[in-house]
From Swiss-Prot:
The modification Phosphoserine is found at residues 253, 283. Residues 250-263, 356-386 have a biased composition (Polar residues). The N-terminus adopts a forkhead-associated (FHA) like fold. It comes from the Eukaryota. It comes from Schizosaccharomyces pombe (strain 972 / ATCC 24843). The keyword Signal does not apply. This is DNA damage response protein Mdb1. Keywords: Cell cycle, Chromosome, Cytoplasm, Cytoskeleton, DNA damage, Nucleus, Phosphoprotein. Changing residue 392 to A: Loss of in vitro interaction with phosphorylated hta1 peptide containing the S/T-Q motif. Abolishes ionizing radiation induced foci (IRIF) formation at nuclear DNA double strand breaks (DSBs). SUPFAM superfamilies: BRCT domain. Residues 177-237, 249-386, 591-624 are annotated as: Disordered. The gene is mdb1. Residues 376-468 form the BRCT domain. Disruption phenotype: Strongly resistant to the microtubule depolymerizing drug thiabendazole (TBZ). No effect on DNA damage sensitivity in response to ionizing radiation (IR), ultraviolet (UV), hydroxyurea (HU) or camptothecin (CPT) compared to wild-type. One of its GO terms (biological process) is mitotic G2 DNA damage checkpoint signaling.
Length: 624
């Protein structure tokens, strides 16, 4: 399978690989710069180990926690974007051969994913989710709930990462063709038009399930059906009224409902209220009504039998003015308002379910995606509620992870301005990337004993009382660990790094060096012409660095790479300490790209060979 990430293409092997930030590099070691990991199992593509913003179709997938990597199935011809960059998957001919070979051997089965769950389990859950909670007595109610049960047998609900078919959409597909095309003009329930939305609204408002094929109904049968609609039983009218009251957005207490239905002594107020509650829970109207449907107020008013008998004492907070406004509200407006509140609750739940250990920095979004002031203020409030920490040369144990999760602490992957403190491992101190970043930003350094004492006390202690100490490192490198402030020694400085240093750094070490210098306020120049400008600091290696030797021969000062780390620790640059003198290390001098010693240039000390010119006989001697 071939993957195109932006403008770059790369071929993925059978088992899969990693996609890194510096390009489409697959089948490499897993590092901090890996965006996603792809798995190619039996010609089916999966994504896991997500550290980027991934969108599969129109669904945003949350990043993966470090201890739990979910598989997300990518359907064929599905739009996938990683960090807002489109990704295109192309199948190759050898993929089909590998699939046939793997199917013969039976080596692997496709695992279950949040988007491709166990079908039997999901079907069982779908049936249980729509089970009747009340034993309905009327045939009309049983027909309406059988409609929902029949719909649940036809659809397999997916997870919240994928879109689901609603019960109302299922009714459109199953029963829209069975509704008679010709309706009586004297029908008192709803004026039926040719659109599918109005037909579905009639099904929901009437609460009826039209059975059989009525495409060839006669006019007499339609009139008889309308007459049957006018002569409904009391139970059927009660069930329909409960739905009509909910659709119009009116809220009734059990007493008001019982007063409006006082003509039927067989129904108690508690039973009517329970049926209304069950109708609100099981009815698909709340989430599936299309807000774009154009339903006239007159049709809803005709549909409601007892809408004019609502007791005004039930809503004492309504004045006569806003009572009229409340009665004019239509079902689409109520559904749209409830849909907005539901979507807001879902977005808050997704933010709470984000993995704790995932704090990966991504490219800045466009202006259209910038949050408004309210979202920014809420983000600041969330930041104040949590304490962010980073560990360096120290591994968290399971009790520590559970304590951090319970007490609102957050573990970041890298050091940022939002980091509150950094936990270091036991001495000796190591000059790691996170340690140097924390020192440059002025972030406190804390001993690993801090978390141990927090677990013993059962609460979050003050980390300022657990300062990290290593006197040997302080004496060796000439700095103080308790000197916590933002470093400014590299502000406005330009640095050039030779190719020998860049090639010697493995993996992401060179990117870590760049991030440390940029955080400290330095500028990295890559042009050798700019390296020859005044006040440019040139970093090179003392040995095996021809570029550094040539620059030193032209009169430029060249320094060791240790200048960066120790200058950040001390907050000053000691140029003389890190200056490289190639002439003192070796007697050779640089001429172009060749090392020519003084003896080789003067010819002194050269051994005469037997083939020297004075050892050869002259031509006259050879003739004699």
């Amino acid at each position: 399978m071939e993957i195109q990430f932006g403008n770059q293409r790369c071929r993925m092997v059978n088992s899969g690989g990693f996609l890194a930030t510096d390009g489409s590099h697959l089948k490499e070691m897993e590092t901090d710069d890996v965006l996603v990991e792809f798995l190619n199992i039996e010609h089916q593509l999966f994504i896991r180990n997500i550290r980027a913003i991934v969108k599969i179709a129109d669904t945003t997938v949350l990043p993966s926690a470090s201890d739990k990597k979910l598989l997300y199935y990518v359907f064929d011809e599905t739009r996938v974007r990683i960090n807002d960059t489109p990704v295109i998957f192309s199948k190759l001919e050898e993929d089909n051969a590998n699939v046939n070979e793997g199917s013969k051997m039976g080596v692997m089965t496709v695992p279950n994913t949040p988007q491709k769950p166990n079908l039997q389990q999901q079907k069982f859950e779908a049936i249980n989710a729509n089970e009747d909670q009340i034993d309905y007595s009327s045939n009309l109610e049983q027909n309406y709930n059988s409609l929902i049960r029949q719909g649940s047998d036809q659809v397999i609900p997916l997870s919240r990462f994928a879109s689901e078919k609603s019960a109302l959409e299922l009714e459109k597909e199953l029963f829209s063709e069975r509704i008679p095309e010709s309706q009586s003009a004297a029908e008192p329930v709803l004026k039926v038009e040719n659109s599918e939305n109005d037909l579905d609204e009639k099904l929901v408002l009437d609460g009826q399930h039209v059975e059989g094929d009525h495409s060839s109904d006669t006019e007499e049968e339609v009139v008889s059906e309308d007459q049957k609609q006018l002569n409904k039983t009391d139970d059927e009218s009660t069930f329909i009224e409960s739905h009509q009251i909910y659709i119009q957005g009116e809220t009734k207490s059990p007493s008001s409902v019982s007063q409006s239905l006082s003509g039927d002594p067989s129904l108690k107020p508690a039973e009517v209220f329970d049926r209304k509650q069950s109708a609100e829970i099981n009815s698909p109207i709340e989430k599936d009504v299309n807000p774009q449907q154009n339903i006239s107020d007159s049709s809803i008013k005709n549909n409601s039998i007892h809408s004019d008998e609502v007791n005004p004492e039930v809503r004492p907070d309504l004045t006569p003015s806003n009572e009229n406004e409340e009665s004019k509200r239509s079902a689409p407006e109520i559904a749209l308002k409830e849909k907005e509140s539901t979507s807001q609750d879902e977005s808050n739940r997704e933010a709470e379910e984000a993995p704790i250990s995932t704090n990966y920095s991504f490219p800045s979004s466009s202006l259209e995606d910038q949050p408004d002031k309210n979202v920014q203020s809420s983000a600041v409030e969330n930041k104040n509620k949590h304490t962010n920490l980073v560990t360096s040369s120290f591994n968290l144990t399971k009790p520590m992870k559970s304590f951090i999760r319970r007490n609102g602490l957050r573990v970041q992957e890298s050091v940022t301005d939002e980091t509150d403190f950094v936990i270091l491992g036991s001495p000796p101190l190591r000059r790691t990337h996170k340690f140097l970043l924390a020192t440059s930003l002025g972030i406190p350094l804390v001993s690993s004993q801090y978390l141990t004492d927090c677990i013993k006390s059962g609460k979050v202690l003050d980390f300022r009382s657990y300062k990290y100490k290593d006197e040997e490192a302080e004496a060796k490198w000439g700095f103080r660990l308790d000197d916590i402030h933002r470093r400014t020694c590299f502000n406005g400085k330009r640095l050039y790094i030779t190719k020998a240093i860049r090639d010697s750094m493995v993996g992401d070490s060179i990117h870590g060096l760049y991030s440390i210098l940029e955080t400290s306020g330095a500028e990295i120049v890559g042009d050798i012409k700019r390296a020859q400008e005044k006040d440019t600091i040139i970093l090179a290696q003392p040995d095996n660095d021809q570029e550094g030797r040539n620059m030193s021969a032209t009169g430029l000062n060249v320094y060791k790479i240790e200048l960066v780390a120790l200058s950040i620790l001390r907050d000053r640059i000691d140029f003389d300490e890190f200056l490289i003198d190639y002439d003192a290390d070796s007697p050779t001098k640089v001429i172009g790209k060749r090392n020519v010693s003084k003896a080789s240039r003067t010819g002194q000390g050269r051994k005469r060979s037997s083939r020297s010119s004075w050892n050869k006989p002259s031509a006259k001697e050879q003739r004699t």
